Every structure is written in structure tokens, then in C-alpha cells.
Amino acid sequence: MAVRPVLAVGSYLPHAPWPWGVIDQAARVLLPASTTVRAAVSLPNASAQLVRASGVLPADGTRRAVLYLHGGAFLTCGANSHGRLVELLSKFADSPVLVVDYRLIPKHSIGMALDDCHDGYRWLRLLGYEPEQIVLAGDSAGGYLALALAQRLQEVGEEPAALVAISPLLQLAKEHKQAHPNIKTDAMFPARAFDALDALVASAAARNQVDGEPEELYEPLEHITPGLPRTLIHVSGSEVLLHDAQLAAAKLAAAGVPAEVRVWPGQVHDFQVAASMLPEAIRSLRQIGEYIREATG
């Protein structure tokens, strides 16, 4: 695939001013015309987009809602790049979907991104949704944010209906991924990509002061406890993030949290983003939609 060589080159110069923002801007132009409703939402430090596929009722605090946290290694992508995925998710889940355009590294830290995601959740709560009506969902780095947000909410006694993670990056530590057999078969991520991400995440955290100290890096898989939302994970059988998916499922199950991993052979990382071209992506999103509907009654 063409993506892997680009990431390989970028991994040698992670701090160079690569135009990562262009990806989401270009995707906005490429979104096909449809009857899907997309409304801009303002959050305290970020923006969001409320997406409602044709036939889905407005977000009014009834039925269900999905809080979607996009992937992109914490440094790129947004509501536009994930437009088709989110549109189909809204359709199959029969639900409005709030996509948070959280702040990105390297200018901002992962902690700041998580704050923005929390603000998105609060926005849905203020709209009238109860925790048991809200599903947290995300792909790749968005899977990390979804799980970290679920843990933050657990600390204040709120448990969303479910958590859905697509090809999730759930562990910032790179060593186990780089040693995984799939590092040789992953069509997107060379081993050095995780070195580059590690450097960018660490430098962004060092610049963000929390109570007078640099932001600490948070590992969600080190904080798995009973009471987290039931979880569904979809992952490619050949991608290196299969490691994170299987480790998360094992830890969740050990804590008594219902967790299911569905492995898709022959697919690439985050193949659901290509839903306009891949029948398998549509099948995956249909299954996820059914899971969300069942979890929210």
C-alpha cells in the first residue's frame, strides 16, 4: 500500500513540520453528496460534528447516541476523513453520532485530546442522554481515547452502555508491538512508525504542564478494573495492533467485563475507513451497529 512508504519516511523525521492537517481538509472536499445531516458543534477547546444518517431521528436525549473518537495516531484526521465510516455507523446503529475533532499532537498533548473527548461526552449529557444511552466508539488512536475516557468516567460513577474499538491502539508502549509477528505483515505500520509516535507523544506531554509538572503518559491497559463498559473490538488479522486488541480483551475478561474480539483476516488496519470501497468494511460496521442497538436497548 502507498501509506506504508509515507509513514516510513515520516518516521525518520517525526518532528518535521509535516502537513498532517491537509488530510482532513482534503477529505472534506472528497465527501460524496448525500442526505446525511452534519451539524457543527462547539466545545470549550475544540469542535465536533453531529452526524445523522438519512432516516435517523434527531439527537434529543431519547433513544441512543454514539460518541465517536477518530483515529490518526493522535496527530491527523478528523470528522471529514472518517465521514463515510461515521455515516454508515449512524445508519446501522440508528443513532446520531458526535465526532470530536479533538486537539492533536504535536502542538497539543494526548491529555488535552482526552479533555476534548470528555467535553463531547458532557455535551451529550447536557442534551439529555443518560450514560446507559451513550456508546463510546473509536478507531486506532481513538480506541485509546475511548477506553481512557471510559476509565475517567468510571471514577465519577458513570458507565456508558458500551465501548466499541476498531483496530485500536490501546497501549502507548511500543516494544511488544515491534516484536509482534504481524510487524512483518502489517500493510501500514513499519516498526519505526512506533518509534516516531513514541517521540511525538512524549515531547507533547512534556510541554503540557499539569499541576506544575509535565503530563504523565497514561496506559489504559494498566487500569482495567471491574465495572467498565462491555466492549466489542474489530481488528485485522494481519495488523500489528492485533496485539493490543487481544491483550485488552484478556484483561477485560479477567476483570469480569464482557469483551469480544472479532478478527478480520485479509484486511488492513482500520479498513472500515474505506467503507465506500470494501464490502468487508460495510459488514463490519453493520455488525457494530447491531451491537450498539442491542447494548442500548
From Swiss-Prot:
Keyword hit for Zinc-finger: no
Gene3D superfamilies xrefs: alpha/beta hydrolase
pH dependence: Optimum pH is 8.0 (with pNP-butyrate as substrate).
Class of enzymatic activity (EC top level): hydrolase
Localization of this protein: Secreted
Dependence of activity on temperature: Optimum temperature is 40 degrees Celsius (with pNP-butyrate as substrate).
Main location group: secreted
Residues of the active site: 140, 239, 269
UniProt note on regulation of activity: Inhibited by the ionic detergent SDS and by the serine protease inhibitor PMSF. Inhibited by the FDA approved drugs Diosmin, Acarbose and Ouabain. These drugs remain bound in the active site pocket and could be probable drug candidates to combat TB disease.
Keyword Acetylation annotated: no
Signals that turn on the gene: Up-regulated in nutritive stress but not in acidic and oxidative stress.
Keywords: Hydrolase, Secreted
GO molecular function, one term: acetylesterase activity
Reaction catalysed by this enzyme: a fatty acid ester + H2O = an aliphatic alcohol + a fatty acid + H(+); a butanoate ester + H2O = an aliphatic alcohol + butanoate + H(+); an acetyl ester + H2O = an aliphatic alcohol + acetate + H(+); decanoate ester + H2O = decanoate + an aliphatic alcohol + H(+)
GO CC list: extracellular region
Role summary: Esterase that shows preference for short chain fatty acids. Contributes to the growth of M.tuberculosis during the nutritive stress. Elicits strong humoral response in both extrapulmonary and relapsed cases of tuberculosis patients.
Any further remark recorded for this protein: Was identified as a drug target.
Protein name: Esterase LipU
Organism of derivation: Mycobacterium tuberculosis (strain ATCC 25618 / H37Rv)
Lineage summary: Bacteria, Bacillati, Actinomycetota, Actinomycetes, Mycobacteriales
Gene that encodes the chain: lipU
